[in-house]
């Protein structure tokens, strides 16, 4: 293939000059001849010069170094050999367990499935987490976002979902760690290993310390592996149901922002890249379910300064089937998971999908909590005594519901000392229905805090008296 030479280096962005009749195409991978570094072409500037992003550190590079064009986009290993392995953005193993034993590779840039290949999701995916199953149920083959500011529990929620779904679900999972803490990636690996499901998980990491090129493309690497599992036919001619976990989708946007100005683009609102919606759409449209197989995706979304109107989380909202919003106010009450029951939504919360009983109980819970929210100002100024008897009852039930929405997690056992609880959906509905009906008005609200099913609250009440 053609060879060129480096003519300019600005951080992660590198300009390479090629002969005019042998210019690489956009998204072609280039390799340095004398160093182990891959570049990805982003723009053709003319006069034989292309602008590229480095998929690694550009330290030690200098002008005039030789670069070879591979003539194809970055491709990564796919298939069963990737399971149980930790790989980087280029699909190279980083777990010191030898090379990935496969010749099957797939380019990280793929077209999204065509409209007529898509399948509509209607089945509910039970998570065992009460607040999620009741108020923002997940769809099999759907897309879910966990929104939250710094330190409200996105990663812990993500880990619990992996614990409850990936272990119960006999299918395959892909975990893409995008710009997050290396420690969390290590914890995740050991968590999977200890629970004997490592052979069903492929892990791709581009952590916080990596250059922006790695963080920009690592989500696509993980997605490409998940797509292969989805499209790979078994003996019955069907694809697989795959789980794709992305932590954190905001860092994907942030990496794009870091290189956008270096690529010569004018920044848009709040300094984000002008191509924000298009970049997000290109990634999200590929995370979808076809008639052959499905990808159920759970994505953590960091919310800068707790502002949900920030362009990055706001752009992500449009692509999701369910949004789980984690609230700092609820976390400050000591209620975990700190899911905001009035802000979190799901397209599946429809009587035609979840059934009348589930829908009625969920809306009853939300209306009780909403009424409590409205009464809080009155209580703060005038006190409880000024409320009508009916409103006092609403407040008492709302406080019980609020506490019953908390739940001990398996992944937090080592910190809290209380064993994790998995609550089946029918138990969740039964519990909240009973609280709304007033069957537990005689129990103290503390009995409902950090328990699993409603029977545990009744047992706990006996120990409180």
Swiss-Prot record:
Membrane topology recorded in Swiss-Prot or TrEMBL: Peripheral membrane protein
Location(s) in or outside the cell: Cell inner membrane
Binding site for ATP: 148-155
Entry's Gene Ontology molecular function annotations: ATP binding; ATP hydrolysis activity; proton-transporting ATP synthase activity, rotational mechanism
CDD domains per the UniProt record, alphabetical: ATP-synt_F1_beta_C, ATP-synt_F1_beta_N, F1-ATPase_beta_CD
Catalysed reactions listed for this entry: ATP + H2O + 4 H(+)(in) = ADP + phosphate + 5 H(+)(out)
Top-tier EC class: translocase
GO CC terms in record: plasma membrane; proton-transporting ATP synthase complex
Keywords linked to the UniProt accession: ATP synthesis, ATP-binding, Cell inner membrane, Cell membrane, CF(1), Hydrogen ion transport, Ion transport, Membrane, Nucleotide-binding, Translocase, Transport
UniProt-listed Enzyme Commission number(s): 7.1.2.2
Entries under Pfam families matching the protein: ATP-synt_ab, ATP-synt_ab_N, ATP-synt_VA_C
Function per UniProt: Produces ATP from ADP in the presence of a proton gradient across the membrane. The catalytic sites are hosted primarily by the beta subunits.
Record family assignment: Belongs to the ATPase alpha/beta chains family.
Subunit structure: F-type ATPases have 2 components, CF(1) - the catalytic core - and CF(0) - the membrane proton channel. CF(1) has five subunits: alpha(3), beta(3), gamma(1), delta(1), epsilon(1). CF(0) has three main subunits: a(1), b(2) and c(9-12). The alpha and beta chains form an alternating ring which encloses part of the gamma chain. CF(1) is attached to CF(0) by a central stalk formed by the gamma and epsilon chains, while a peripheral stalk is formed by the delta and b chains.
Name this protein carries in UniProt: ATP synthase subunit beta
Organism name: Chromobacterium violaceum (strain ATCC 12472 / DSM 30191 / JCM 1249 / CCUG 213 / NBRC 12614 / NCIMB 9131 / NCTC 9757 / MK)
Gene designation: atpD
């Amino acid at each position: 293939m053609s060879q060129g030479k480096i003519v300019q280096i600005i951080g992660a962005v590198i300009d390479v000059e090629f002969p005019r009749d042998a210019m690489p195409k956009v998204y072609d991978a280039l390799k340095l001849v004398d160093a182990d570094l891959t570049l990805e072409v982003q723009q053709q500037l003319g006069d034989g010069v292309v602008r590229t992003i480095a998929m690694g550190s550009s330290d030690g590079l200098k002008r005039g170094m030789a670069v070879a064009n591979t003539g194809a986009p970055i491709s990564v290993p796919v298939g069963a050999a990737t399971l149980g392995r930790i790989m980087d953005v280029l699909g190279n193993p980083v777990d010191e367990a030898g090379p990935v034993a496969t010749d099957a590779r797939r380019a990280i840039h793929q077209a999204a499935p065509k409209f007529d290949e898509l399948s509509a999701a209607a089945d509910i995916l039970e998570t065992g987490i009460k607040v999620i199953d009741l108020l923002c149920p997940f769809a099999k083959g759907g897309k879910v976002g966990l929104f939250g500011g710094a330190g409200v529990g996105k990663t812990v929620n993500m880990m619990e979902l992996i614990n409850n779904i990936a272990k119960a679900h006999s299918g395959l999972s892909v975990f893409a760690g995008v710009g997050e803490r290396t420690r969390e990636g290590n914890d995740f690996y050991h968590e999977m290993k200890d629970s004997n499901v490592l052979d069903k998980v492929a892990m791709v990491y581009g952590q916080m310390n990596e250059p922006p090129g790695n963080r920009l493309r690592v989500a696509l690497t993980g997605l490409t592996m998940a797509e292969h599992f989805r499209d790979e036919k078994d003996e019955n001619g069907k694809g697989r149901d795959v789980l794709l976990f992305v932590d954190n989708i905001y860092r994907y946007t942030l990496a794009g922002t870091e290189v956008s100005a270096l690529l010569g683009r004018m920044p848009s609102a709040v300094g984000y890249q002008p191509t924000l919606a298009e970049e997000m759409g290109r990634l999200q449209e590929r995370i979808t379910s076809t008639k052959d197989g499905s990808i159920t995706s759970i994505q953590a979304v960091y919310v800068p300064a707790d502002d949900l109107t920030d362009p990055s989380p706001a752009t992500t909202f449009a692509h999701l089937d369910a949004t789980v919003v984690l609230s700092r106010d609820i976390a400050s009450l000591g209620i975990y998971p700190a899911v905001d029951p009035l802000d979190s939504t799901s397209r599946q919360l429809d009587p035609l999908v979840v059934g009348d009983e589930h829908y009625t109980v969920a809306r009853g819970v939300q209306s009780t909590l909403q009424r409590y929210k409205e009464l809080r100002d009155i209580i703060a100024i005038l006190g409880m005594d000024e409320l009508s008897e009916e409103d006092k009852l609403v407040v008492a039930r709302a406080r019980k519901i609020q506490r019953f929405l908390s739940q001990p997690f398996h992944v937090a056992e080592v910190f809290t000392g209380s064993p994790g609880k998995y609550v089946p959906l029918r138990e969740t509905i039964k519990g909240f229905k009973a609280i709304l009906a007033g069957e537990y008005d005689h129990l103290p609200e503390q009995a409902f805090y950090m328990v699993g099913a409603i029977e545990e609250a009744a047992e706990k009440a006996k120990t409180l008296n």
